[in-house]
Amino acid sequence: MKRKTILWWGRFDPNYSRNSIIRKHLIDLNYKIIDFKPLVSKFGYMEANFRGVETPDLVWVPCFRHRDILSARKWSAQRNIKLLFDPLISSWDKEVHEKNRVYSQELSDKLRSKESALFKEADIVLSDTSVHADLFRRKLGLSKVKNPIVYVGAEENLFKPFPKNIATDRKFDVLFYGSFISLHGAEIIVRAANLISNQLDVKWTLLGNGPNLKECKRLAEELPNVFFEDNISYSNLPERINRADLLLGIFGDSTKAGSVIPNKVFQSLACGKTVITRCSDAYPEK
């Protein structure tokens, strides 16, 4: 039986976790993957024709590559090939709601209409949560487009339980790691630590860097049980997760924060750790 071929189209990062996880599973399912990274997204279809890119069974535009959609659609339509888009985010939703930029209703509607037309170019649009799927259908009009949910997941060959090193004199380590953006709500973690600051047998560790780190450090100035660690390499992250006793997810109160299940939740669960995160409709009921 001939192997089916999937053409990954766009100026994407194959090592980004969403991409690497999906690509590994596709390869495990015996799909052949071809990469095409156009020099200029807008003229990708011309470059693909010039370079004689192999005709695949499916064209896949990976996450964040909204600007590659139209060119990929033009090329795939000429060959009667289906186009799949894995956006991971709505640019309109991020611009208007997550970044809290002030737009008139008219301009917001124009941005939404533009993205709706873009998404409708695809035959299949993946969602990473049921909330995003609902957003794509209600706000971007994708009811007639196949819109399955594929969760972000984790690289299970990397994120897995390590042998336990039991030490009776160590403190209970509560770990948060991330980029300290508003979606993460790291300040809420520091405030929670303050509520039990008298329990010195609990160590709160916040690992990473980002725009809200300075504020978190300010809030933690008088807290003896809150510690900060610098960024570490991605390959060392599983070991650090396994050293912790409890992992923390995200606690932002924005609509966006309620729409996602972050990588850290899947990674920590894959390491066999208990995770506390905010409640939202994004999480499966079972």
Predicted regions and their residues:
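Conserved donor-binding/catalytic core segment of Leloir-type glycosyltransferases
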Residues: 7, 167-193, 204-205
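Glycosyltransferase donor-sugar binding loop
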Residues: 177, 203-216
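Short donor-sugar binding/catalytic loops of nucleotide-sugar-dependent glycosyltransferases
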Residues: 12, 177-181, 196, 210, ...
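Nucleotide-sugar-dependent
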Residues: 93, 184, 233-240, 247-270, ...
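Membrane-proximal helix-turn-helix segments that form the acceptor-binding/catalytic region
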Residues: 48-50, 74-78, 105-125
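Carbohydrate-associated surface elements
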Residues: 131, 153
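Active-site proximal beta-strand in glycosyltransferases
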Residues: 76-95
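Nucleotide-activated donor-binding/catalytic signature segment of Leloir-type glycosyltransferases, i.e.
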Residues: 214-239, 243-246
